[in-house]
């Protein structure tokens, strides 16, 4: 009985440890195109695009709290929807439970969660939910929910 309990504890601790530490050694590269935003807006119709995208603002990521982050983030409007786009030069230290948030003037807003980070490298598109007032924010954050720590931030100008 005692050996079973010890084995179960070791398995649980090992699993949690792997979940927390493995992202530091694993990179996930994403390669989404800007055209995918237009396709989504048009409902995946195969005809030539009639919807145009407009870059509203952009900024460069900087790492925070000892983490590395670099690359370009853009706020893009397509039709009546807004998107955050990370360009191909984007990279951030990988970690557990990373999410994309919006923030303002040096503070991320926990109520402005966009989506979980698709990968720690490469071009990515994130649709901003209609419930979020884009005009209230001027920053994009990569935030680790598990440890409540910022990995990177881009100020949008």
Regions found by a protein language model. Give the residues of each.
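Transition segment at domain starts
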Residues: 21-79
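Beta-strand signatures of extracellular beta-sandwich domains
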Residues: 99-101
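Exposed aromatic-hydrophobic patches
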Residues: 85-87, 123-131
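Surface-exposed loop/edge segments in extracytoplasmic proteins
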Residues: 107-114
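Short, exposed beta-strand-loop hairpins at the edges of beta-sheets
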Residues: 129-155
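Short proline/glycine- and polar residue-rich coil/turn motifs
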Residues: 116-122
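Hydrophobic membrane-insertion alpha-helices, especially the h-region
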Residues: 4-19
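A short beta-turn/strand-edge loop motif at beta-sheet boundaries
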Residues: 90-94
């Amino acid at each position: 009985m005692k050996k079973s309990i010890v084995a179960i504890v070791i398995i649980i601790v090992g699993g949690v440890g792997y979940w927390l530490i493995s992202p530091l050694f694993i990179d996930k590269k994403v390669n989404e195109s800007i055209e995918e935003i237009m396709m989504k807006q048009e409902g995946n119709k195969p005809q030539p695009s009639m919807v145009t995208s407009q870059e509203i603002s952009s900024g460069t990521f900087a790492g925070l709290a000892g983490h590395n982050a670099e690359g370009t983030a853009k706020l893009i409007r397509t039709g009546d929807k807004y998107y955050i786009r990370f360009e191909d030069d984007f990279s951030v230290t990988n970690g557990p439970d990373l999410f994309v948030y919006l923030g303002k003037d040096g503070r991320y807003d926990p109520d402005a969660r966009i989506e979980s980070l698709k990968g720690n490298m490469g071009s990515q598109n994130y649709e901003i939910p209609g419930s979020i007032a884009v005009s209230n924010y001027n920053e994009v954050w990569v935030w680790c929910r598990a440890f409540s720590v910022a990995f990177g931030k881009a100020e949008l100008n």
